[in-house]
Swiss-Prot record:
One example of a Gene Ontology biological process annotation: translation
Function statement: Component of the large ribosomal subunit. The ribosome is a large ribonucleoprotein complex responsible for the synthesis of proteins in the cell.
Pfam families in UniProt: Ribosomal_L36e
Subunit note: Component of the large ribosomal subunit.
Organism: Xenopus tropicalis
Subcellular localization(s) per the UniProt record: Cytoplasm, Cytosol; Cytoplasm
PANTHER family, sorted: 60S RIBOSOMAL PROTEIN L36
Keywords: Cytoplasm, Ribonucleoprotein, Ribosomal protein
Domain of life of the organism encoding this protein: Eukaryota
Name of the protein: Large ribosomal subunit protein eL36
Gene: rpl36
Listed InterPro entries: Ribosomal_eL36, Ribosomal_eL36_sf
PROSITE patterns according to UniProt: RIBOSOMAL_L36E
Length: 105
């Protein structure tokens, strides 16, 4: 804790020191996407396309059935947080497709 005032008593008591800045531990990077992983996943997505449940979820998102899409994905994937992340990913894909279609016209 950084000392604000050189006092003998109270919350701010003690000798004034500069805090050591430690670099974050290696275990903190778990789950962060690397460039290589992102490249591989994008390549696989380009080759394989979307799974059938993802296509159906995208159809639900197209007709603004966001809650129904979330429930559907949660049933297929298993957890609420992963389903929310998948729904967000698919809605971003739809937005990109819409943007590309508008740019082409």
């Amino acid at each position: 804790m950084a000392i604000r005032y050189p006092m003998a008593v109270g919350l701010n008591k003690g000798h004034r020191v500069t805090k050591n800045v430690t670099k974050p531990r290696h275990c903190r990077r778990r789950g962060r996407l690397t460039k290589h992983t992102k490249f591989v996943r994008d390549m696989i997505r380009e080759v394989c396309g979307f799974a059938p449940y993802e296509r159906r979820a995208m159809e639900l998102l197209k007709v603004s059935k966001d809650k129904r899409a979330l429930k559907f994905i949660k049933k297929r994937i298993g957890t609420h947080i992963r389903a929310k992340r998948k729904r967000e990913e698919l809605s971003n894909v739809l937005a990109a497709m819409r943007k590309a279609a508008a740019k082409k016209d």
